[in-house]
Curated annotation (Swiss-Prot):
HAMAP family: PNPase
Primary location group: cytoplasm
Residues the entry annotates as binding Mg(2+): D541, D547
UniProt organism field: Nocardia farcinica (strain IFM 10152)
Domain KH: 607-666
Catalyzed chemical reaction(s): RNA(n+1) + phosphate = RNA(n) + a ribonucleoside 5'-diphosphate
The organism's place on the tree of life at top rank: Bacteria
Recorded name of the encoding gene: pnp
Protein biosynthesis as UniProt keyword: no
Protein name per Swiss-Prot or TrEMBL: Polyribonucleotide nucleotidyltransferase
Length: 764
């Protein structure tokens, strides 16, 4: 892809002070999508504001503002990204008690992370002014997702805000949709900005963000990808499986779309951007500080970094750091923060140097080596399913809970999902890294990690028809030293199998890293060397150029997350790293299979849930007036009953006999076998009248014992003299008329014949 000075700008001034630019996204036979950026009409007091439209129906406002004074006490860039979902965007009133928007939804939080990850590294190093990006969803076509539109809107508003920002950043979702016709070479087409309906028929989809570099190529900055819920079904039907090679093709397919979006933003900025202001920058350290720290610490630090154990290594590094800071404190009085930052930088240089030149890592492993693995199941006594997965010092406890489908999470957001049957929650307590900190509601990082593990497992979960349960999976990070999110995937697979969930295939995950630099080769020549690392440590994650997490089965990828600091990764390097990840995943799956290979028997503490189908026109009869019938069944059997609009009935109970009793009662109403003359029942008197007693034989099926039959041959003046409501009465069906009305006679339990047959006197 090359840039040409003759390229015509897409930006125009539509009215005084209002500018817009357009990016046309051509999907061939799948049609064209239009992304339009407009500025100058809304939120004019923000440093930069842009309204982004997708096909004129979906409308997002992004406003970027910056603080006036720097927060020089911070040692990080204070960027905040917020996504505000407005329910009026979908023509809805919020479902909360106060009927207004409250805390952000999970979708909004995940979108914040999608925006933050590519935007943050695009700002100049050393910036300490607070920058806030607020994206408000004003209108949403229900067939579209807004998250990738939000990435572009946030980038565009930041690009024109006069900030030291090296954008623009383009974001696109591409989905691999299988070919339906005879020509299926390549397995399908990567479609940009797919609709919700198109995603339902896709094999794989990914959100990719990047920017155009000087060469005209697109540097990928962030990837969030997943296999779809129907991937196994589609692959069995002949669709292309989302292997590592297919994923790499998808990244290449996304680049032209990202380039168009970046150029539309750049065109808008050329007309409407404010001049870049001068902001004070606070470099982490001065050159003199770095030289002093390097000279004082390099030799000892190099030895400390070869210690294999995390705690022992970190204790030694902390000891060296304190000694160096004490030694240099007088020379650099008042610059203690610079000393700490320089020490970190020297550590980073040594870690990378050891990897690139020696081919060894700080814990002594080779580049593709995995740490010691351990897997066991059934570690929490009363849990429905549990497992403990360890990879080196990373330790994850997975716990599964099963319940009725009615316990599925109800989702009140702008997304197409209204309920979640599978819920994955990830907890990262401070003790997992040997620290103290806040414990309580999950932070954005925890929500993001839980969502990644959830996406990795959804493709292999059984359907609701095959397994009629709501499933809550909790991942507890008990120890952390590298990729607890991928450890959560492994622990969750084990825990789900232990709970008896019939997964379509086991899933494992691994975190990969990439380190690159210009080095001198054996011939004395300079070359750029790329080294992929398997199963990265926390330090390698922090000091590397790219980290990506890959989860999947033995056959294909189910989820992928990638973040890189490089301006482009050669495709062969990425393909090699993905292949390396596949080998590691297979090794982990082998270890997991030794712990548990097939679903266990369900825990005795888990509810037994059965799904049955009844005619839709019988739902009212099963429920009864004011819920009388269903409440009676629940009371009699102790089962929980949930009825869907399509006639699916979920029956749950703590034991099998209770569930079966409830099912029999429901079937007796909804799928009745008509009773026959001569059948006997032990019924309950449900009503008395002047002419007889009504006896319930089955739920919803009553018969009448005439007053003349109640006296055992003697005349009865009043029905209540013989029976009352609630009494048990053994009866036999004497007759069923053509309208289905049942006539009953009492049965003497000690005799073979009905009691009323002996004397027929008094019959009216």
């Amino acid at each position: 892809m090359t840039q040409t000075s003759e390229r015509k700008s897409s930006a125009v001034e539509v009215e005084p002070g209002v500018f817009e630019s357009v990016a046309l996204i051509d999907n061939g036979s799948y049609g064209t999508r239009t992304v339009r950026f407009e500025t100058g009409r809304l939120a004019r007091q923000a440093a930069g504001s842009v309204v982004a439209y997708l096909d004129d129906e979906t409308m997002l406002l992004s406003a970027t503002t910056a603080g006036k004074t720097p927060k020089d006490q911070f040692d990080f860039f204070p960027l905040t990204v917020d996504v505000e979902e407005r329910m009026y965007a979908a023509g809805r009133i919020p479902g909360s008690f106060f009927r207004r928007e409250g805390r952000p939804s999970t979708d909004a939080i995940l979108t914040c992370r999608l925006i933050d990850r590519p935007l943050r590294p695009s700002f100049v190093d050393g910036l300490r002014n607070e920058v806030q990006v607020v994206v408000t969803v004003l209108s949403l076509d229900p067939k579209d997702l807004y998250d990738v539109v939000a990435i572009n809107a946030a980038s565009a508003s930041t690009q024109i805000a006069g900030l030291p920002f090296s954008g623009p950043v383009g974001g696109v979702r591409v989905a691999l949709i299988p070919d339906q016709g005879a020509n299926s070479a390549g397995g399908g087409q990567w479609v940009a900005f797919p609709t919700v309906e198109q995603l339902e028929g896709a094999v794989f989809d990914m959100v990719v963000a990047g920017r155009v570099v000087e060469s005209g190529d697109v540097a990928i900055m962030m990837v969030e990808a997943e296999a779809t819920e129907k991937v196994i079904e589609l692959v069995e039907g002949g669709a292309q499986a989302p292997t590592e090679a297919v994923v790499a093709e998808g990244l290449e397919a996304a680049k032209p779309f990202i380039a168009r979006l970046c150029r539309a933003q750049q065109d808008l900025a050329e007309l409407a951007a404010k001049p870049t202001e001068e902001f004070p920058l606070f470099p982490p350290y001065g050159p003199d500080v770095y030289e002093a720290v390097e000279g004082a610490a390099e030799a000892e630090l190099g030895e400390a970094l070869s210690i294999a154990g995390k705690q022992e290594r970190e204790e030694k590094i902390d000891e060296i750091k304190l000694a160096v800071l004490d030694r240099l404190a007088e020379q650099f009085a008042g610059r203690e923060k610079e000393l700490g930052a320089a020490f970190r930088s020297v550590t980073k240089k040594l870690v990378r140097q050891r990897i690139l030149t020696d081919g060894f890592r700080i814990d002594g492993r080779g580049l593709a080596d995995i740490r010691a693995l351990s897997a066991e199941v059934a570690v929490v006594p009363r849990a429905h399913g549990s497992a403990l997965f360890e990879r080196g010092e990373t330790q994850i406890l997975g716990v599964t809970t099963l319940d009725m489908v009615k316990m599925a999470q109800q989702v009140d957001s702008l997304g197409p999902e209204t309920s979640k049957r599978y819920m994955h929650h990830y907890n990262f307590p401070p003790f997992s890294t040997g620290e103290t900190g806040r414990v309580g509601s999950p932070k954005r990082r925890e929500i993001g990690h839980g969502a990644l593990a959830e996406r990795a497992l959804i493709p292999v979960l059984p359907s609701q028809e095959d397994f009629p349960y709501a499933i809550r999976q909790v991942s507890e990070a008990l120890g952390s030293n590298g990729s607890t999110s991928m450890g959560s995937v492994c622990a969750s697979t084990l825990s789900l199998l232990n709970a008896g969930v019939p997964l379509k295939a086991p899933v494992a995950g691994i975190a990969m890293g990439l380190v690159s630099d210009t080095v001198t080769n054996d011939k004395g020549e300079q070359e750029v060397r790329y080294v992929a690392l398997t199963d990265i440590l926390g330090a390698e994650d922090a000091f590397g150029d790219m980290d990506f997490k890959v989860a999947g089965t033995r056959e294909f990828v189910t989820a992928l997350q990638l973040d890189t600091k490089l301006d482009g990764i050669p495709s062969q390097v990425l393909a090699g790293a993905l292949s390396q990840a596949h080998d590691a995943r297979t090794t982990i799956l082998d270890v997991m299979a030794e712990a548990i290979a097939t679903p266990d028997e369900m825990s005795p503490y888990a509810p037994r849930v059965t799904a049955i189908k009844i005619p839709v026109d019988k739902i009212g009869e099963v429920i009864g007036p004011k819920g009388k019938v269903i409440n009676q069944i629940t009371e009699d059997t102790g089962a929980n009953i949930s009825i869907e609009d399509d006639g699916t009935v979920f029956v749950g109970a703590t034991d099998g006999p209770s569930a079966q009793a409830a099912i029999d009662a429901i079937n007796a109403i909804a799928n009745p076998q008509l009773p026959k003359v001569g059948e006997r029942f032990l019924g309950t008197v449900v009503k008395t009248t002047a002419f007889g007693a009504f006896v319930s034989l089955l739920p919803g099926r009553d018969g009448l014992v005439h007053i003349s039959k109640l006296g055992n041959g003697k005349r009865v003046a009043k029905v209540e003299d013989v029976v009352n409501v609630g009494d048990k009465l053994r009866v036999e069906i004497a007759d069923i008329d053509n309208r289905g009305k049942i006539s009953l006679v009492p049965v003497d339990e000690n005799a073979d014949e009905p009691a009323a047959d002996a004397v027929d006197a008094g019959t009216e």
